[in-house]
């Protein structure tokens, strides 16, 4: 008996293996004519067959034969004289084939013995139980549907293989069930977000991906050029200003799930191309947006994990209880009780402390931006359970409505979980004159060297001048939410094809 599987193939030169497989393909073309047939129609998947028949005993399957038509990739092969076994994997799982020379015929059996792991097979047969009780397909017809020319790796481990996992996601998905599960969960999460929004009477819309003026967030854009119009365009950094134009137009509850692009660094938390949901609702403020954010995240946890208590990096995260709330100064003092109110109101002390902690001074002037910079150094990473940080300074919130009680702050929040930002929302600024003044301030910051400051968007001001109702808005990062709910250490683990440096 000989046995092969993808975790125990002997080391062999890949070029030699591929040459041998190409020779086999040439022989198939010569003898069969059609090497990649497309007339086989699968009717059954592995997982439903196991679910329905694993508990059925051998005698019952023999008494009432169950005919099946299955197909998938061969992941294991055991050749034993006149009979062999093959384990085949489809999108739902794996099932074993029992292949006997007497059933499939001498020619097909001889062909099967030359086939390789990774080849895609189609089979017709009846269900059976082996001596060990494993549900299998006793094959009566067997076909090679697609020849695999490149051998599958044994497994992924270590840094080099982690890189390969991201670069060749198609291989990762073949051999790594955890990766397949992650992306199935991702799909469930996106579907759940959409269900929540539709259930709240929001309208799903699509807004431009290429903008004549970048806006809606503080970030560096990717720049491209429209040849016919001979003008620069920017891949969108956020859909915010277009979505709020729709609220002006009378679409009072809108949302969009789509990509944003930011021409910035890559890390375990950042990919230049990422997915967000942004949603806007007229006649509400940031309290309603926080309520919606909690609802979305809880529902996604229930859909993906079956519970609102999840584990991340070995530590529990409770998404079921009401999310905590702190102001920026409140969070700093909560996690750093040694700081005094006098220190936190002293611009010189704040600058000194930020530098002492290894942080960078913010480009935006003002005590509020310094407090935010200190928060990022000494408190943000400690926000493990869901926490809303509220009332951001006006100088770093150019699109948020100012507080009636304190004009130095805005009705803005960010949500932090496991020390990472997951959402950003606010009561929208709907005073066009105030918005124009803030845009001018952003332009001054850009002229002073702040690459992430916003441009002046005259058309958005024109839209606001028609009247933007009191509105709340929020954006939630889908990739980071998937990271949280799949216990993924890197954003690359939850994006099918993350950006990588050239090989």
Swiss-Prot record:
The keyword NADP does not apply. Belongs to the class-II aminoacyl-tRNA synthetase family. One of its GO terms (molecular function) is lysine-tRNA ligase activity. Coiled coil: none annotated. This is Lysine--tRNA ligase. PANTHER family: LYSINE--TRNA LIGASE, CHLOROPLASTIC_MITOCHONDRIAL (PTHR42918:SF15), LYSYL-TRNA SYNTHETASE (PTHR42918). Pfam families: tRNA-synt_2, tRNA_anti-codon. CDD domains: LysRS_core (cd00775), LysRS_N (cd04322). The keyword Cytoplasm applies. It is an enzyme of class 6 (ligase). Its cofactor is Mg(2+). Mg(2+) 2 binds at residue 421. NCBIfam families: lysS_bact, PRK00484.1. It is found in: Cytoplasm. GO terms for biological process: lysyl-tRNA aminoacylation. Keywords: Aminoacyl-tRNA synthetase, ATP-binding, Cytoplasm, Ligase, Magnesium, Metal-binding, Nucleotide-binding, Protein biosynthesis. Binds 3 Mg(2+) ions per subunit. Its main location: cytoplasm. Mg(2+) 1 binds at residues 414, 421.
């Amino acid at each position: 008996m000989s046995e092969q599987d993808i975790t125990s193939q002997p080391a062999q030169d890949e070029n030699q293996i591929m040459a041998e497989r190409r020779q086999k393909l040439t022989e198939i073309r010569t003898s069969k004519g059609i090497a990649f047939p497309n007339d086989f129609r699968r009717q059954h998947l592995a997982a439903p067959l196991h679910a329905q028949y694993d508990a059925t005993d051998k005698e019952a399957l023999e008494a009432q034969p169950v005919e099946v038509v299955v197909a998938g990739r061969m992941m294991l092969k055991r050749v034993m004289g006149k009979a062999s076994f093959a384990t085949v994997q489809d999108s739902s799982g794996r099932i074993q084939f029992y292949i006997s020379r007497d059933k499939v015929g001498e020619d097909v059996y001889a062909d099967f013995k030359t086939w390789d792991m990774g080849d895609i097979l189609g089979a017709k047969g009846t269900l059976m139980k082996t001596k060990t009780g494993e549900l299998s397909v006793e094959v009566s017809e067997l076909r090679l549907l697609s020849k695999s020319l490149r051998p599958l790796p044994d497994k992924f481990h270590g840094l080099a293989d982690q890189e390969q996992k991201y670069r060749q996601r198609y291989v990762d998905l073949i051999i790594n069930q955890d990766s397949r599960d992650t992306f199935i969960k991702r799909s469930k999460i996106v579907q759940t977000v959409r269900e929540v929004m539709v259930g709240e009477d929001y309208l799903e819309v699509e807004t431009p991906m290429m903008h004549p003026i970048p806006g809606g967030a503080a970030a560096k854009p990717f720049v491209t050029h429209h040849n016919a119009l001979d003008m620069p365009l920017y891949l969108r950094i956020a859909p915010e200003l277009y979505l709020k134009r729709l609220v002006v137009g009378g679409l009072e509850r809108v949302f969009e799930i789509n990509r944003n692009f930011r021409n910035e660094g890559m890390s375990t938390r950042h990919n230049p191309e990422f997915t967000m949901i942004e949603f806007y609702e007229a006649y509400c403020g940031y309290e309603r947006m926080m309520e919606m954010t909690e609802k979305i995240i809880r529902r996604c946890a229930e859909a993906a994990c079956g519970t609102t208590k999840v584990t991340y990096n070995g530590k529990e995260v409770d998404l079921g209880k009401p999310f905590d709330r702190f102001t920026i100064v409140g969070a700093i003092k909560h996690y750093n009780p040694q700081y005094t109110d006098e220190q936190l109101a002293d611009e010189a002390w704040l600058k000194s402390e930020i530098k002492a902690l290894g942080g960078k001074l913010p480009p935006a002037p003002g005590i509020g931006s310094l407090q935010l910079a200190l928060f990022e150094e000494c408190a943000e990473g400690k926000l493990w359970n869901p926490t809303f940080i509220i009332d951001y300074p006006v100088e770093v919130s150019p699109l948020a409505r100012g507080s009636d009680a304190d004009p130095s702050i805005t009705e803005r929040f960010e949500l932090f979980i496991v020390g990472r930002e997951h959402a950003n929302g606010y009561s929208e600024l709907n005073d066009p004159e105030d918005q124009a003044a803030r845009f001018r301030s952003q332009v001054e910051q850009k002229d002073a060297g702040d690459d992430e400051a916003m441009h002046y968007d005259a058309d958005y001001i024109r839209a606001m001048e028609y009247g933007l109702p009191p509105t709340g808005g929020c954006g939630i990062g889908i990739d980071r939410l998937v990271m949280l709910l799949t216990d993924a250490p890197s954003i690359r683990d939850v994006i099918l094809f993350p950006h990588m440096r050239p090989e």
